[in-house]
Design a protein with these regions (language model features):
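N-terminal Rossmann NAD(P)H-binding glycine-rich loop of SDR-like oxidoreductase domains
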Residues: 6-26
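NAD(P)H-binding glycine-rich loop region in Rossmannoid oxidoreductase-like domains
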Residues: 38-39, 48-89, 97, 115-117
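Conserved Rossmann-fold NAD(P)-dependent oxidoreductase catalytic core, especially the SDR/UDP-sugar
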Residues: 89-138
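Active-site Tyr-X1-5-Lys
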Residues: 133-161
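Glycine-rich "substrate-gating" loop/helix at the edge of Rossmann-like oxidoreductase active sites
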Residues: 134-136, 166-174, 194-205
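Glycine/proline-rich active-site loop of Rossmann-fold NAD(P)-dependent oxidoreductases
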Residues: 143, 156-158, 169-179, 213-225
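Alpha-helical substrate-binding/gating segment
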Residues: 181-190, 199-225
Length: 225
């Protein structure tokens, strides 16, 4: 496929940087939209801005063929305004900029938290509904944002798709495994249940590859999570 211009929000983060790396390997031009131009993958250009500022987002996305919207505020604790400002308003700004500038493809990084309702999920798939009541500001803001992304599919020629990777780990992981290992070393790692509980985790390479495949097959995947 011909080289394209891609914008990656959160492209200096753990998953975002791996997506940027994959795009650069393909020969694409890559712009990283981030609050700070730190840890910029070599070969990418930086556009510093705030997702909550429509002008910042619009300026970054202008001229892009594809946008990977990876940036988000994650976590269980924190002010509602912060989660909704970054995750929902920020996503609305990304969608508006895609429509404004005629972007062809939008790949959104969501989370399985959008369908979690306290009960265990065994063999769950894309047909799971959003819960009646969300357990965290994070889950609610991401679900509402995902909904906006999927509703934008087909508007002004935009093709949009959402992915829900869970607990991303791998080389350079700044959060998940380091915390687990640190708690284990301190004897603070708690077992929940009888020890047979399972949790799905996603290697960062697989998560990045999934984003590139979503772009490659977006004519089939568009409008879906």
């Amino acid at each position: 496929s011909r080289p394209m211009k891609a914008v990656v929000t959160g492209g200096a983060g753990f998953l975002g940087a791996k997506i940027v790396e994959r795009l650069l390997e393909r020969g694409d031009e890559v712009v990283v939209f981030s609050r700070k131009p730190n840890n910029l993958p070599a070969g990418a250009s930086a556009h510093v801005g705030d997702l909550r500022n429509q002008d910042d987002v619009s300026d970054a996305i202008k001229g892009a063929d594809a946008v990977f919207h990876v940036a988000a505020k994650a976590g269980v604790w924190g002010p509602r305004d912060e989660f909704f400002g970054i995750n929902l308003t920020g996503t609305r700004n990304v969608v508006a900029a895609c429509h404004q500038h005629g972007v062809r493809d939008l790949i959104y990084t969501s989370t399985p938290s959008v369908v979690f309702d306290r009960g265990g999920i065994d063999g769950g798939d894309e047909s799971l509904p959003y819960p009646k009541k969300f357990l965290t500001h994070y889950a609610e803001s991401k679900a509402l944002a995902e909904n906006e992304v999927l509703a934008a599919d087909g508007v002004s020629g935009l093709r949009a798709v959402s992915l829900r990777p869970h607990l991303i780990w791998g080389h350079g992981d700044p959060h998940l495994l380091p915390r687990v290992l640190e708690r284990a070393r301190r004897g603070k790692l708690k077992q929940v249940g009888d020890g047979r509980n399972r949790v799905d985790i996603t290697h960062v390479n697989d998560a990045a590859d999934a984003h590139l495949l979503a772009l490659e097959y977006i004519d089939r995947a568009a409008g879906n999570a």
